[in-house]
């Protein structure tokens, strides 16, 4: 699927955007981002009345809208205000934004362990939703096609289908399955802001607000307060998008090793279809005739798999990716959870993404 051919967002999002007369604006952000535009004045749109009303409507429809943050307020408390007052309240937040502390709770996992979940206040959730609505189309235009977590019209089923395609059609039977150690707790804030800047998100006021969100104090169940210097808490409205921004660089690094390698500066590999799109079939044919080693990535949030041809290539990929994550993203892997698997012997354990459904439910705040 080419970037320019990606599906539009879910119908519910489209309905909200159309109702608040924002769809054309969001479509323009996507189109401009595809063309490489730099965005330096996003706060005007983020803090606009229409965007705030749409964010309020979206948060109100979430199952977690009745869950209180540290201030004990829920969407029912904001519902007591008329539209003019809650819009003014959110706009006031943007003028000098300092988020309230995030309440941390432990959500049980099927294996008996727990997952830490950060619950911002209801006002901070609406602020984050306002930012998300504007940043998402800009980032979607930059994201790699085979990243499937927390994105419009993508799911675990799509990730599994892509894995099956690489196995059954491309005959790539070796998988490098890498687990990033405590990914959400170890995101480097400086690197993340730099990645957003390189994506064209260069509104300095907005980037300062996002820094404030990332540094929001965390209140534990025992009353202890943490002041994070890294990480993005699971449970934040903006956290899934930010995690995809961080790992998008990994996606494109892997893609540049084979899948998109011809796109980088060599015109002889490029041939256009009748409609003007790039003929990928022609490029793949040339690649297969070369001495290059095929490698593909399929990613769902921080869970990703690398597909290659044989054992030697797999272990080289394992070592190179581990080093790249450490040097480029300041992230470590979990050796005990990371492995190289021969799918002819162990198919199901390495291709299943069904355990990721837990992420989809707990993040609906």
Describe the function of each predicted region.
Residues 1-2:
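N-terminal mitochondrial targeting presequence
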Residues 7, 17-237:
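Conserved pre-catalytic core of RNA-dependent polymerases
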Residues 12:
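Basic Arg/Gly/Lys-rich low-complexity intrinsically disordered segments
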Residues 71-77, 339-342, 361:
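Short, solvent-exposed coil/turn linker segments
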Residues 94, 101, 142-146, 151, ...:
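Conserved polymerase palm-domain catalytic core
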Residues 126, 312-313, 360:
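A generic structural signal for alpha-helix starts
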Residues 354-361:
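Conserved small/polar residues in nucleotide/adenosyl-binding loops
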Residues 364-365:
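Short, ordered, surface-exposed loop/turn motifs in non-cytosolic proteins
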């Amino acid at each position: 699927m080419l970037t320019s051919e990606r599906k539009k967002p879910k119908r519910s999002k489209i309905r909200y955007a159309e109702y608040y007369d924002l769809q054309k604006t969001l479509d323009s952000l996507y189109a401009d981002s595809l063309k490489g535009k730099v965005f330096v004045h996003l706060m005007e749109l983020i803090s606009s009345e229409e965007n705030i009303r749409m964010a309020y409507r979206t948060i109100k429809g979430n199952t977690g809208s009745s869950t209180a943050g540290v201030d004990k307020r829920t969407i029912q408390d904001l519902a007591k205000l008329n539209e003019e007052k809650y819009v003014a309240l959110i706009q006031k937040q943007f003028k000098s934004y300092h988020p309230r502390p995030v309440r941390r709770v432990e959500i049980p996992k099927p294996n008996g362990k727990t997952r830490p979940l950060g619950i911002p206040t209801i006002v901070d959730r609406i602020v984050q939703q306002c930012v998300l609505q504007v940043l998402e189309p800009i980032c979607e235009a930059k994201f790699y096609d085979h990243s499937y977590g927390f994105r419009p019209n993508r799911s675990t089923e799509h990730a599994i289908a892509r894995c099956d395609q690489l196995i059954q059609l491309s005959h790539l039977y070796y998988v490098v399955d890498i687990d990033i150690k405590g990914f959400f707790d170890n995101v480097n804030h400086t690197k993340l802001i730099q990645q957003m800047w390189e994506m064209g998100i260069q509104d300095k006021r907005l980037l300062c607000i996002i820094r404030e969100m990332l540094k929001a104090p965390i209140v534990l169940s025992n009353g202890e307060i943490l002041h994070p210097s890294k990480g993005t808490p699971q449970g934040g409205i903006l956290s899934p998008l930010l995690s995809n921004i961080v790992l998008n660089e990994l996606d494109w690094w892997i893609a540049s090793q084979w899948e998109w390698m011809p796109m980088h500066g060599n015109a002889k590999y490029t041939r256009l279809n009748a409609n003007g799109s790039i003929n990928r079939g022609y490029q793949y044919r040339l690649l297969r005739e070369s001495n290059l080693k095929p490698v593909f990535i399929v990613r769902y949030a921080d869970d990703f798999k690398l597909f290659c041809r044989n054992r030697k290539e797999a272990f080289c990929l394992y070592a190179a990716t581990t080093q790249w994550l450490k040097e480029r993203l300041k992230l470590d892997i979990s050796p005990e959870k990371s492995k190289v698997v021969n799918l002819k012997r162990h198919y199901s354990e390495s291709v299943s993404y069904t355990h990721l459904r837990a992420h989809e439910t707990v993040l609906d705040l």
